[in-house]
Regions:
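Ordered hydrophobic segments in well-structured contexts
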Residues: 96-98, 108, 122, 137-141, ...
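Secretory targeting signatures
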Residues: 1-45
Length: 171
């Protein structure tokens, strides 16, 4: 094999690796958290991403004397995944998000949390495939496991990943 052929093969291999890397790169962590529900789109060579970004926060209050009244706050806005004001010492709070795949192809759903609220949040279902026109209800839980009493903020993203080409698996 000639020297020119070897160089051509090495360059070709590097270009293929670069294309694969760029084609499968997922959306990055947000630089700034949203204040209201926001939609954005992101594409690579192989996949389209639709991202719904939700603000999220909770204020964890200390439990004072047994007979003291404490004000709890609940957020009922459907676009807001805030958990309000809760007492500390093992409180569990849940919010529900309803998702529908309106497309005629499968979509992978990925849920992510960002900010200092992240360690407190969990999902009933994550990293799953939604079939065409399927509806799914997901519980988003926040559990205060003897966490420091303060405000926690961040963002919860619902990412829908769809293959641009039908022959590609969504994984």
């Amino acid at each position: 094999m000639s020297k020119e052929t070897k160089i051509f093969l090495i360059i070709s291999l590097l270009v293929i690796i670069l294309i694969i890397y760029l084609g499968f790169q997922e959306p990055s962590e947000p630089q700034e958290f949203v204040k209201n529900k926001t939609f954005s789109n992101y594409s690579t060579l192989f996949f389209d991403y639709e991202i719904s970004r939700y603000p999220s926060s909770v204020e964890i209050k200390p439990l004072e004397a047994v007979n003291e009244n404490i004000t709890l706050g609940f957020v009922t806005d459907p676009w807001n995944i805030n958990f309000g004001i809760i007492p500390g010492n093992g409180t569990l709070v849940k919010r529900t998000v309803e998702l529908t795949n309106l497309k005629d192809e499968n979509s992978k759903v990925i849920l992510r949390t960002y900010g200092n609220i992240s360690p407190l949040v969990s999902f009933s279902k994550n990293n799953f495939i939604m079939h065409p026109h399927e509806k799914v209800s997901i519980e988003i839980s926040l559990y205060d496991n003897d966490t420091k009493r303060m405000n926690y903020t961040g963002e919860i993203d619902v990412i829908s990943k769809k293959a641009i080409y039908n022959f590609l698996p969504i994984s």
